[in-house]
Amino acid sequence: MALEPYDPCPCGSSKKFKFCCQPIIEELGAVERLIAEKQPKQALLAAEKLEPEHALNPLLLRNKIMAFLMLERQQEVLTLIRQLQQAHPQDPYGYYFDIRWHLFMSDWESTRPLVEEHLTFIGEKNPALAYQVAIEVVDELLNNGCFMAVWRYLFDALLWARSEDDARHVMSAFHELNKSNDIPLPFRNLYQLRALPENQPNQAEFAEVMQVANGRHWNQAAQLFEALSEKDPHQPVLSFNAGLCYAWSGDLAAAAELLGRAGDDLPDFESAVELETLAQLHDQQLPEVQIPLQTYRYRVQSVSRLLSQLDQEQRLHRQPLPPERPDVDRPPAAVYLLLDRPRNSGTADDLNSLPVSIGTVLILDEVRDPAAPGELYVRSLIPAFTDADHELVVRVAGEQIDVTAADGWGLLPSDDGIPRDVAGLNFNIVPPPGLRRSEILKLVNAHARHVVFDKWTQLPLESLDGMTPAEAARDPELHMPVCAAINVLASVTETANYSLNVDELRQHLGLPAVEPMVCQTSEELKLSSIQDCLRLAFNEVPAEVVRDAFPMLASTRAIHPLRKLLDAIYDREISIPEFDVPAVCRMACSLAIRVLDLDAAQMWCERGRAANLRVGADLVARADWDLNELEVAALSNNEEKVIELLRKCAREYFLKIPQTKQQILQLLKLERLDSPRVQAIMSGTDLQTVGAGISDGGLWTPESAAASASGGKLWVPGQD
């Protein structure tokens, strides 16, 4: 839409268009088009025509900054940013570019003051610009492990989103981060600053600090809250708010100290455990408490020959490749686990004999571009990885890799590390060959339980001042930090796909059982943390609280609390919007299978089938429940039940739902179920299945080919 002479000028100044940029709007438009077309040099030439008369025009300065950014001429960028800020102090773009420049050229410690000083101002002037800043800050904070700050800035980005696409992008980011096992569960929450009780001193000073925090000056607010806490050292609200603001500012060390101090002063045990958990998790993100991990990179002469050599090494275990993603330019040619011993050396009877992975080997295929040869990466996973392990890979690769020292090759600089308190834990076993899937699942769970209950409990922890959890649990004064250490451990086991039952481990160590939480309204629930929701007393809270807790807990994938929630939903007949009873049963069955509680899985199969009958389910839904029950029977090694269900599926589903047969074949392959009876059913030669089908009028046989050709309803299971 064309601008009128007396419209506000698009440059953002307080002047009217006629008295500001109208005389040069066409020339400015030409510069902007060249920037959009990624022609920065031509854009700068076009901009020169407007100088020196219009050298300080804000639109011209913005476009010149963009051009120099594209040319990576950072010093000129900074000079122009300073000109824009000095000539137009109310232009949010000056501060936006300043923050972007520091994010690219400096570290978070140097960038944080700029963000906290100017972001709220940018949001008031140009919310869309503030949205961009918040999203870029999120990327930086993720790289630094400042996960509570990530949630804070994502929430602010959602407030500043001015389009449906931007809002969807933020919600998608929340969804992806909630699914990430790399982010400990207690961090997946937006905590709120707490109000000071009315009967406490320092009310006026507290209100002033809250105003500072409302302006998103997190570090300044944290220091002021901390100063107030020194006046009233046993008021947990002050130290909690200080710790929370430090966490939002990305100061992990200060956040750990203040949140831990707040936990010490809380009378409620579970709330104290929650804050101590946050403190320990922040501590573990600090570089000084992490053991560095190593990554090596080498040029490959011939990828195919290299793979042939690596396949022969018994301490390398080749992994199935994931499906290729369209956004990946160079998908891996192969991935290997580097094991601590030969891959076939362990036995299922001796958990300590099983090989565990201590590193990974990644090979990227060569491409036609000579600047992109084949590459081999060797990466350590745990501190047990030594120089000898690295040398093993180099020796096996032999002449197929170039070990000549050069920039960007050999040992790569890296900030990656693993916290000392979990460095001695390794859940990544390689099961012996020839096991069924159910046997592998049981072995993996048994090994993970062995690592947690037998090894971790005897491991000296820095968070417990060098004591083991078993020792600390015997001292009532240390119950709170030990329970917090268990919560931290649960976040580690989640990355290994082992769902730790926190209450069970507490009881094993003689610690207090997890105290259930009861809240009477959805508003109370909204103010609760993720950790609080995990201990909800689902049978004692109103139905509306259960309904609102469901999406929150479902997103956490915390198996044991989620199973309790689903039990309560079913027992109390609570309706979950857009989530019917069969769906509840399906999720509960899946979770029961995940933890190998096969009796519960069978019960949920029966409940789900009954629920489907009540709502008049179609054939596909009925088939799904039979497939679920078949999986449970296979995992239970109940061959008679497997045969019964296979015959039923062959009679009722193979013709009408062809994919059913493929799903069953995959299950049978995983479970190594290939007895003659199973083969007969799947090949269509099982006489009982054939006979039952004839009585139903549903079989095809060679003798009835003519009837089939004339449209008869005749078919043999397995006949395609």
Give short role names for the model-derived ranges:
Residues 86-92, 103-107, 113-124, 142, ...:
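TPR/TPR-like (Sel1-like) alpha-helical repeat modules
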Residues 22-28, 54-62, 89-96, 126-135, ...:
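Generic helix N-cap/helix-start motif at coil->alpha-helix transitions
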Residues 18-19, 48-55, 82-90, 117-127, ...:
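Solenoid-like repeat scaffolds
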Residues 26-79, 97, 136, 140, ...:
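Alpha-helical segment of the N-proximal tetratricopeptide repeat
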